[in-house]
């Protein structure tokens, strides 16, 4: 049987992309397969922090040390994606033995200081009541003191994407929207390839390699089950609530009514609050944000930041973590370590499954797995992912303008390539240009409008995409000969996805206003009419068109039936 590749990696989340990058940099021929888009699951639906895992210090010191070490590497290879977030652990007079608690928190943070140098972090400091209220006047006034904490925030989606791009630029065949329907096995039962269904072209194809890596995250057991291999995870559902602006000056460590620790943090130009952590047994492909989960998060925020009700949440998001299985523990106490299984122990050689892990430790996990794979294939090249910058991460100049700063935060050194493709503003809320839309299509594996949204932040602002998605769609479809029905189906999918994320945090008059605004944009763009028209005419084609707030213009070329 022909060997198409040395290694097939299933799953383009942070671990899959990290492994593909590591292996390709060692000179191996790699295929990276993803059923949806890059970073579809928990890799983009997390808190967005490369933190050292202070919450794990109580249960899991090894994970804290590992996370801090890898956070230091990530800060050096992707400085344009990381931002320093100063946190505060506030203590209030209403807490049981508040003064004693404050002393205990400081002692705990002193222990964490030991690991801070590994990630370029700053040591803690203790603040008085007056110092805290000067820095964060929105806090409850009965705060008696607090302790600071230094952590890194990150654009988690782009971190995953840049690993995929670097892998691709070093020879990896990246295939998104390809679903594994079966494995190819030889006479002895070893896995020697995969059968794939291309979800866009609706075609089947087959790839072969001596080693396949199952890095599909929470979907891992489902993939392994195709071979009759049982293994268990504790899938954990995590929900976040997002505000489209900065509510606080500092990140805050807060607690839910049940004592669960959460983060309340300024993240780029947004505010993110979360996460919940609950065992999850339902549909992995369609986890839903529940009203009770939103209320739980906002209740925790309100408990320390009374002014939160003056701000309107913008949207929510949810992810499912592939946490290592453990019986008899609550979700917080589960290990965030990672592991991998070589399935020859199950009688199926050629397959390795990845389990557990966390964003901050993805690079170390990738190195460990790649070391094993390289050894099995007789490859003696060493890992270089801890010292080689990710795309755009080398030789950064200081930005001279705000717009340049935004570009460099997303693209680093490659911002100039984005500017060459266009500088007209498409999205005012997130400062997205037409060049960024074109760059996503040409260089970042964007296959549809929703893919562009994930790469650029389109639609994450206060308007929910209603003011920018039409224009972005026009730019994205430049020069394409695509059926009107497909063109508008993509636009509708992007708008509906954004509305779904906003729906759970909008109530009363706000929800009614949102629905009226959506209806207006559907009508202004003629979306409802054209979708109906396209359904009745098989051969309608479109050429690029543009929308303006006052009038929408559309040029259609029709073939007579």
Model-assigned labels for residue ranges:
Residues 214-228:
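Flavin (primarily FAD) binding-site architecture
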Residues 147-207:
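Helical element adjacent to the flavin cofactor pocket in flavoenzyme catalytic cores
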Residues 48-135:
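Dinucleotide-binding Rossmann-like beta1-alpha1 core, especially the glycine-rich loop
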Residues 16:
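N-terminal Rossmann-fold NAD(P) dinucleotide-binding loop
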Residues 10, 207-217:
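Short hydrophobic core segments
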Residues 166, 232-239, 243-248, 255-272, ...:
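C-terminal catalytic lobe of FAD-dependent flavoproteins
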Residues 2-13:
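Beta1/beta-strand and adjacent pyrophosphate-binding region of the FAD-binding site
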Residues 24-44:
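Glycine-rich FAD pyrophosphate-binding loop
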